[in-house]
UniProtKB/Swiss-Prot annotation:
Cofactor(s) demanded: pyridoxal 5'-phosphate
Entry protein name: LL-diaminopimelate aminotransferase
Binding site for pyridoxal 5'-phosphate: 67, 101-102, 126, 176, 207, 235-237, 246
Reaction(s) this enzyme catalyzes, per UniProt: (2S,6S)-2,6-diaminopimelate + 2-oxoglutarate = (S)-2,3,4,5-tetrahydrodipicolinate + L-glutamate + H2O + H(+)
Stored SUPFAM superfamilies: PLP-dependent transferases (SSF53383)
The gene coding this protein: dapL
One Pfam family linked to the record: Aminotran_1_2
Pathway named in the protein's UniProt entry: Amino-acid biosynthesis; L-lysine biosynthesis via DAP pathway; LL-2,6-diaminopimelate from (S)-tetrahydrodipicolinate (aminotransferase route): step 1/1
Top-level EC class: transferase
Function as written in the Swiss-Prot or TrEMBL entry: Involved in the synthesis of meso-diaminopimelate (m-DAP or DL-DAP), required for both lysine and peptidoglycan biosynthesis. Catalyzes the direct conversion of tetrahydrodipicolinate to LL-diaminopimelate.
Sequence similarity: Belongs to the class-I pyridoxal-phosphate-dependent aminotransferase family. LL-diaminopimelate aminotransferase subfamily.
Keywords annotated in UniProt: Aminotransferase, Pyridoxal phosphate, Transferase
Amino acid sequence: MQSAHRLNNLPPYLFADLDKMVQKEQAKGKEIIKLGIGDPGMKPPEGIIKAATQEMYKGENHGYPAYDGIDKLKHAIKEYYQSRFGVELNPDREILTLIGSKEGIANISQAILNPGDINFIPDPSYPVYKNGTILAGGTPHSMPLKQDNGFIPELESIPQSRLSKGKIVFMNYPNNPTSAVASKDFYSHAVKFCQKNKLLLCNDAAYSEIAFDDYQPQSLLSVPGAKEVAIEFNSLSKTFNMTGWRVGFVVGNEKAISALAKYKTNVDSGVFTPLQLAATHALENRHEYIPDILKAYKERRDLVIEFLEEAGFHVYHPKATFYVWAQVPGNQDSFNFTKSLLTKTGVVVTPGIGFGKHGEGYFRIALTVTKDRLKTAMEKICEYFS
């Protein structure tokens, strides 16, 4: 049996090659420290686990869930956006729960694109923006993110011939992999740009609560007029260490929300109700849980920056996310650098090229192991480059 032709259009998955190399080194008995995947190394707070467990014992919670999300969770999301960002949302028309934000980001292209339509994709970026576009029959157009511009796309550089066929502009701030952040002025500019060119603006805000040094990421939807053209994806995965639970949501433009909801109704059955209720608890009690999580990430961030800069690396100082983005030393390409680092030290980092061609020359460290484990990894890296 042959697979669908559209799967052949997907770019090579570089991370699969990296996984094979890791397995090869592990087979040799080498100790491996994995700093490559953005999967928090901490479990969810006990209160969230307890909330989920209690709800699982209730028989009424084991049937099919509401397709668009239970009312309690949607009202918790409404309250969160109002109190955190000053954004008012209609829970019936402007909020949709997701099986993790990843599926929503992938499926928005299925709901919006026609064959040959163009989506504008930041480069480097989370691969699902591009891959979701391809799987929906669309064409991805790269928007370079350059360090000298703060890893912010230059929207005016997009050719008019491409804009006329465009449907979606994807953004992701705070940013993975670069850890860059966007100003409210940029958000305002992006909204006006999409209004002018009749484009849907999609911001992936999965890291909006992972921020340091008194920095407070803003919501795209806090810009006046944003809901006319924009939606924002969010997730409980990173904020509450719930990556395996698969609970996320999207808010904003009601026409885009409606289209995505219609598509999802035909391909999935929503999020398990006890997990939605646990997510409700997490949002309602976020002030109790988030500070300890941020404290751990800040300590790890500071440790990594100190070690890398002492070893001579050029490091982008993150205000947000749990990543550190640094330049590859010397003349090596990013994949061979990470391969060499793995074989010589046992430390796994992510090559920038895995996020797009404009990620070449960089590598990403995920702050997702304990501080002691991270210190060991940094000592190994610094010893190798001394």
